[in-house]
Design a protein with these regions (language model features):
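Non-heme di-metal
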Residues: 1-233
Length: 233
């Protein structure tokens, strides 16, 4: 089995169990049976994830000697923090702004984002992000970020569509977060993967990468399950 076959197989396995499709909370989100307050519970927590995500690439950039990997990290930062898209900075709003627009449409004030407190399961994800940025071997850390970016497509296909269909979010405002992320994933498809595969050279590299990807998946599952417990049907 080649490294690419191994990577694609593991990614497919984990995506087939995506908590954003399988969890009771997200099934109810997709069907429109949550209240606005219950829907906001996820949006608010996911904002914390989005706010921390670029810092993984900042951390990897500072400790990686490989120039091509550092360029890939810099590209991610441009996309997340400066809206780089279709070859230009500002091609989209920055990702923090995109998330605040969801709150605009759901009736939550922008300054409220600064007071969001992480639930324990989201705090665990953020703690893992810190480890990815500063401790986990950077090739393994990039594999975990690539898995999370694949999950973004799942989120767009459930949460993004449901916000428009059921919760009064405008396509050209709050829902832009999801259409932009889908478009970015299509544009960037394969870039990070090509960078990663060059550096998964040994069995130990693959073991570290698999451990990081499975831990990312486990934490997302735990988060999704916690939403179902906090907001029972």
């Amino acid at each position: 089995m080649t490294t690419e076959e191994w990577y694609d197989g593991l990614t497919a396995e984990l995506l087939s169990q995506s908590p954003f499709r399988r969890s009771d909370y997200f099934k109810r989100f997709a069907s429109g049976t949550l209240t606005r307050e219950q829907a906001w519970s996820h949006i608010a927590q996911h904002y914390l994830l989005i706010a921390w995500f670029p810092r993984i690439f900042s951390g990897i950039h500072t400790r990686c000697e490989d120039f091509e990997v550092r360029k890939d990290c810099a590209r991610h930062l441009l996309v997340e923090d400066l809206g780089y898209f279709e070859g230009k900075v500002g091609g989209t709003p920055d990702h923090d702004e995109l998330f605040r627009r969801i709150g605009d449409d759901l009736g939550y004030a922008r300054d409220g984002y600064d007071r969001i407190v992480a639930v324990p399961e989201m705090a665990a994800i953020i703690a893992f992000f810190r480890r990815l940025a500063h401790e986990v071997p950077w090739s393994a850390a990039l594999c975990a970020t690539a898995l999370l970016e694949e999950e973004v497509v799942e989120i767009a296909q459930t949460v993004g569509r449901a916000l428009v269909q059921h919760y009064g979010v405008r396509k050209d405002w709050g829902a832009m977060n999801y259409t932009v992320h889908e478009a970015i994933e299509k544009e960037e498809s394969g870039e990070t993967k090509r960078t990663i595969l060059k550096h998964l050279r040994t069995a130990d590299d693959r073991r570290a990468a698999e451990a990081a990807m499975r831990e990312m998946h486990r934490l997302l599952e735990s988060y999704a399950e916690s939403l179902a417990r906090r907001h029972p049907a």
